[in-house]
Structure formats: structure tokens, C-alpha cells
Amino acid sequence: MYTKDTIVAIATPQGNGGIGIIRISGIDALAIAEKLTKKQLKPRYATFCNVYNDNEIIDHGIVIFFKAPLSYTGEDVVEIQAHGNPFILNLIIKAALNCGARMAKAGEFTERAFLNNKLDLAQAEAVADIINASSEIAAKSAAKSLQGDFSKEINNLLEKLIYLRMYVEASIDFPEEEINFLEDQKIHSSLEEIYKVILAVKNSCKQGVILAEGITLILVGKPNAGKSSLLNALAGKESAIVTSIAGTTRDIVKEHIQINGVPMHIIDTAGLRNSDDIIESEGIKRAIKKIQEADQVLFVTDDYTNSQVKFSDIKEIIPEFYDQIPKDIDITYVHNKIDLLKEVPHNHANHIYISAENNIGIDKLKEHILNKVGYTNQNESIYTARERHVTAINNAFEHIKLAREQLELGNGELLAEELLIVQEYLNSITGEFSSDDLLGEIFSSFCIGK
């Protein structure tokens, strides 16, 4: 629920730094800032001044006042640029609280920007995405969303959709016009254009989610099959103990890397074998849980001579683990240690041949991983997207297909109903019709001070 009180928070990351920024927003922001600085502040001027708690100087720095509505939140906003010592910044926060401000909740500044129409919902989410981007391409894509590229695409689509829906509904309300839905080319061409645009946005959203959230890969296989060596080869550095002793990887090892700018979250699980060791058994439990949450499984085997290994073979290797694997999960069989062969088999289907120790076939494996998730590297057309965007677009796509079916049946009323449903799903992306629960969930994922 939006309250028009005044909020304050540290806007810079935790830890020591040259500069730390305090952000104040709300109806009393200027009064509080002038009480802290004992100066009259002009809008959009950088004023060098001391910062006080009553009459005691806390620090000195630059203070800037942004008068509503020309500010990030659309409210009066003051930013205090002080020295980046957490103790000093917290003293300034306490002084602001004593003057009547309250601590901001996570994402509350951006939430107020959304509620004051400074950003739509997709742009607001892009703020968090640009802060958390883990690759250069992801950061650039988030910047495009923040600038409104994604929102413009959705709004242009909505404009076409609303026009078509109004035309269809008018033909229903005024039957004397005698519009034949089966023969009206205006309806057919408009609906086909909307269908194609939604399909294109659907594909772009899929790419955007990959960039924003990354891909989670699980390395599984028998002990000493080379999972840790493969992890090191993919990451380009050593992150797990590599020995000839079975079961050396005693816990889940996480590594975050990039492949062609795509974030990869690689998890090397404990050696999957029956064990009386409590620590290793716990690792196996974690492995099962992580595999159920993964985008892909890389099943590593040192059976490099058998190109016919398949999903059901896992049951023979680890029968107690087999039933835990979702049967629809994407599995790639990575045949390791091919450096021991005189003649290397050709990659085929989901079977990739590598030598993790000698870095043979690693680039081909990376290419295979990206292909499996459908990443096409069309950077110029990608903007960041979230799972909720993908869900909304997918639902819109399903209902635009139903709309086409109703048009072919000549059923105007059901056609109009399907178009309305598509409109509602698209509206949910930019926040035209969004519940308070959804807004709370989105903005609570932001950092404090943003």
C-alpha cells in the first residue's frame, strides 16, 4: 500500500568506499535535509555542506535536491553524498530518522517511481536486472528494457490488439453492418500480424530470461568420472579437488561462469554412490534436490567407448537415484577421457565426447549447451525478461491461437473474448492491471535504497 510518508536508505553497496550516498524521498525530504545540513537547498544544485545530528557535525559532502516531479521517484528527493564509511552513513540515517523519516523497504524507491508513473512495471524490474546483471550482454539488454524498448514493443502490440477488438465488438453490437468474419480481410490480416508479433516477442523473451537469470547446469555421474575436472575446464580455473580417489568432491561446488555472455550456474554434486560417510550421504541428498531444479543435466561418464549409453543406463549405475530424475529434463551424456583413444567418435544427438583434463571438445560442449536452451545470440533484438513475462507472453500466445480458431469458425463473440484475454495478459507485463500481491513480490526482491 503506497503511503506518502518520507523514506530514507543507503543507496550505495555495503562496505567501505570513497563515497556513500543516502537517499531521502517523500513530502518532508527537503525539510529533513535542510535540518540535517542547516542550509537552504536549491533544486538541482550540488551544495557542499556539513551534515549534522542536532549541533554535532557527522560529516561533510555534496547534497542535491530534486524537486517533484522531476526526480527518480516522482516525489521530492534529496541525495546526500558523504564519505563511504558505514558508521558515518548509519549516523546520517539515524539523524534522518530522528527528523521524521522512516527506513525504506526493499525496492520502495523504485516502487514509488512505478506508482507515480515514472516507470512502468517492466522498466522497474529492469532496474533490478541492470544492478544484478552478471555479464556485459545481460547489462546491455537490461539497459534496453530500462529505456523502455520492451515496454514499447508491448504497448505497440496492445494498440493493434485493442483496435482489432474494438472493430470486432462493434461488428457484433451493430449487426446491420453485416460483417462476415470469415471473409473480412481486415480482421484476418490484423489478427495474423498480431500473431506474428506475439510469436517474435515470445522468442525474444526466452532469450531475455536466459540472459537475466542464466542457465543452471548440474554435473552428475559416477565417482571419479571426471565431473570436477569438467567443472574446472568449463570455468577455466580450479574450483574442486581433483584426485584419483572416488568420492573426493564431498559437497556441492558452485561455479558462475559465462559462455558467449550467457551466465552459467554450474553445480558439481557429490559423487553418487552408496556411502556410510555422513557428509558424503548429505551431499547425495543435495545432489538430488539440485537436479530437480536444474535446466540441464550433464551426465559425465568415463565409458568413452560406448556411444550407445542412454538415459535408462543411469538406473544400472545408480538405481536409487534414477527415480529422482525428472523424465522430461534435458540430459547430455558427456563421454570424458577420450584422450585415451586413438580414434575419437563423432558427437551425435545428446552425446558429446571430451577430455576435460586436456581441454578437448570443451568448446563444442559449450556450443551444445547453448543450443539446447535455444539461445541464438541475437543481441540487437534481446531485452531482459523474467519468468513472469514469459508466462504472460506464452499465455497470450495460446489465446491468440484460440482467437484464430474462433475466427475460422466465424464466432465473433468468442473471438472478442479471446482478444480480451490476450490484452489482459499483455497488460500484466507493463503493470496496467497488477495486483498488490504481485507488486509486493516484485519490489521485495530489490536491494534497500533502490
Swiss-Prot record:
Entry's EC annotation: 3.6.-.-
Pfam families: MMR_HSR1 (PF01926), MnmE_helical (PF12631), TrmE_N (PF10396)
Residues where K(+) binds: 224, 243, 245, 248
Keywords associated with the record: Cytoplasm, GTP-binding, Hydrolase, Magnesium, Metal-binding, Nucleotide-binding, Potassium, tRNA processing
Main localization (coarse): cytoplasm
Binding site for GTP: 224-229, 243-249, 268-271
Its biological purpose: Exhibits a very high intrinsic GTPase hydrolysis rate. Involved in the addition of a carboxymethylaminomethyl (cmnm) group at the wobble position (U34) of certain tRNAs, forming tRNA-cmnm(5)s(2)U34.
Family: Belongs to the TRAFAC class TrmE-Era-EngA-EngB-Septin-like GTPase superfamily. TrmE GTPase family.
Protein name (Swiss-Prot/TrEMBL): tRNA modification GTPase MnmE
Source organism per UniProt: Francisella tularensis subsp. tularensis (strain WY96-3418)
